[in-house]
Amino acid sequence: MRFFRRTRLLFSATFITGLLLLAGALLVGFDIDEEGRVRPASNGVLAQGIENSTDECVVCHVDQTPGIVNQFGESDHFSNNVSCSDCHLVEEGYAGSVQHPNEEFYVLPLSSTAQCAECHREQVAQFNLSRHALPSYVAYAGTDPLTEDQLAMYQSIPERGGIDSRNRNSLHAMEGEAVTRFACETCHNVGRPNPDGSIGNCTACHIRHEFSLEQVRKPETCNACHIGPDHPQWEIYSESGHGISYLTGGDDWNWDAEPGNVTTVDFPAPTCATCHMSGFGLSATTHDVGDRLTWYLASAISSRRPAWEENRVRMQQVCLACHSNNFVDDFYDAGDALVDSINTWVMLSDWMMQPLKDNGLLTAQAFDEPIDFTYFNIWHHWGRTAKFGSWMQGADYVQWHGAYEILHDLAILREEVDAKLEEAGLEPLDLPDNFPSIDAARDVVGSQSE
Ligand code: HEC
Ligand code: HEC
Ligand code: HEC
Ligand code: HEC
Ligand code: HEC
Ligand code: HEC
Ligand code: HEC
Ligand code: HEC
């Protein structure tokens, strides 16, 4: 009895508190949905001008989604009379659209590149030609899910190739959808096809709904994806002279400078965007991030790109705004020589694995025995890291996360290969005494220069 009385008391107390909360919420203007979740109806700090807007979407969404309206109010879109409708309102039946809650019209809940293309045709065309578009998606999904048109578009990208996929896609299959939607896909969906057939997601870099130049020019934007053991561009940049200039003095830079011809007055040192995208010096703004690259650095064994000579000129024109001709030429010669050394070590690792392949001593399944990881890490982590580190000035990544790790894993690879050969009654690898030095690697596989 006592128990029931207590629970009844508890129940009434909860009920009354609930009622009070509800009344309170209604009084101060909170919004409660069918599931009992409460949302603040207005947070009061509206961007200048937006409170006078007569746009029906804005008028209602100020209460429904105040965060979005606030960000939109800060944007150049709002001050240039671009409206919510321009990006979201579509015909009934438009692929990916839904009927707007309580209204007759249809909206795209996630606006697509097709809407941006109405006004920013050039940026979209450049983006579509880059590895941020379909190649990013194909890197984990393969080409099977592409429509005929998308396949043709993918095949028309001159720089889509160059990087052999060496088992990487098998990680996607091994880990399964529940994991990869938070992993591979979070980064690689920058180039995923949308329901309406357009490609990619501009908001992978341009955070909605402000679409601010300052935000997208800052290197933190790129570090959403260009980070970690296999592509540590953010870490490398942070320890370079350029990154240190940004981290210690960037507050004073002219982040909102008009795009097209940004100068050294605006940016005394470069960010990722300056070197790879901004109109700077004689190089025009581009959304094709491959447009200034010489090498396929992400490759196991790097080769030069189809249009590498023109690309290199475009990158060097950026450097030349701040550095001398000789400085830039010396730097490029040194970078090319480093690529040659890393290529040589990776070829040595291929040479070491060859007898296992020839004698059927490896399992068919990728990543099921330690040797698969050792072999993979040599090029996918350490080789890449050393190359990126040299080209973007991160000494620690060239040395301790790069060359040193290569030597370490080559020594382990030798033990792992020899163990398998001996188990099969075969001779161990015949390697020179100074293995795994670069001289030994050159002796075994020859020089790779030019
Ligand atoms: C009378 C109020 C009202 C008007 C007018 C209005 N909206 Fe909405 N809108 C809402 C509400 C309420 C939601 C649902 C919010 C939620 O689910 O949390 C919503 C949701 C949305 C969504 C998300 C839909 C989804 O399924 O995720 C979009 C996009 C949107 N509105 C765009 C617009 C555009 C564009 C206009 C003008 C053409 C507009 N809205 C006009 C109240 C309004
Ligand atoms: C310049 C184009 C553009 C304008 C203008 C714009 N949006 Fe969006 N909006 C987008 C994009 C792009 C996305 C989806 C981003 C993604 O895929 O991650 C989005 C997402 C949304 C979402 C769903 C995501 C969420 O966070 O709930 C809502 C709701 C929305 N917008 C409402 C609005 C409203 C209301 C306005 C006007 C006040 C507006 N948008 C103006 C481009 C725009
Ligand atoms: C209806 C036309 C229209 C649509 C649709 C549109 N924009 Fe814009 N956008 C503009 C205009 C106009 C400006 C201002 C141009 C200027 O300042 O020179 C602008 C400016 C920008 C800027 C530069 C902001 C700045 O501070 O200068 C970015 C970034 C941008 N848009 C991205 C997008 C993206 C991404 C989409 C799609 C999600 C999109 N826009 C959709 C018309 C549009
Ligand atoms: C943190 C973001 C991130 C995650 C997670 C991620 N990648 Fe990547 N991936 C990148 C970036 C950035 C590059 C580009 C490296 C470069 O060019 O320096 C890349 C490059 C690649 C490449 C080489 C490019 C090509 O077109 O062949 C493949 C293949 C690839 N990733 C597959 C995957 C798979 C499969 C997964 C999941 C098992 C995955 N990635 C997870 C960001 C990511
Ligand atoms: C890899 C990140 C990234 C992606 C993805 C991206 N942008 Fe940009 N965008 C930038 C950067 C960085 C700038 C600033 C360039 C500069 O410094 O002038 C910029 C500038 C812009 C501008 C204003 C500059 C100008 O030349 O007028 C527009 C408009 C724009 N982007 C539209 C888009 C559209 C549309 C998409 C999707 C197809 C897109 N962006 C995808 C990084 C990106
Ligand atoms: C949402 C994730 C994401 C963001 C954010 C992002 N990238 Fe990427 N980026 C990728 C992926 C994935 C690849 C590899 C694509 C491939 O090769 O298949 C890539 C490749 C590249 C490449 C090599 C292109 C080539 O042709 O090999 C450059 C350069 C690059 N990104 C620069 C940038 C810069 C600069 C920024 C910031 C302004 C940026 N990225 C932001 C995911 C991202
Ligand atoms: C000083 C200019 C500069 C800055 C700053 C810079 N990069 Fe680079 N980046 C380069 C050069 C040069 C290369 C090598 C180009 C080549 O192949 O010739 C490169 C290579 C790359 C690659 C490798 C592409 C491939 O072939 O696999 C990626 C990805 C990349 N940078 C992204 C970034 C990101 C992200 C940032 C900021 C965190 C950044 N870069 C900062 C100049 C720069
Ligand atoms: C906007 C100006 C600017 C641009 C563009 C620029 N740099 Fe720099 N660079 C600097 C500054 C500033 C430093 C830091 C100098 C110091 O450490 O005293 C620096 C340092 C360097 C260093 C280290 C030099 C040393 O003595 O330690 C290298 C290497 C370098 N830059 C290469 C490049 C390359 C390659 C490019 C083009 C891909 C480039 N930079 C583009 C301004 C620039």
What label would you give each PLM region?
Residues 2-450:
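Short sequence/structural segments immediately N-terminal
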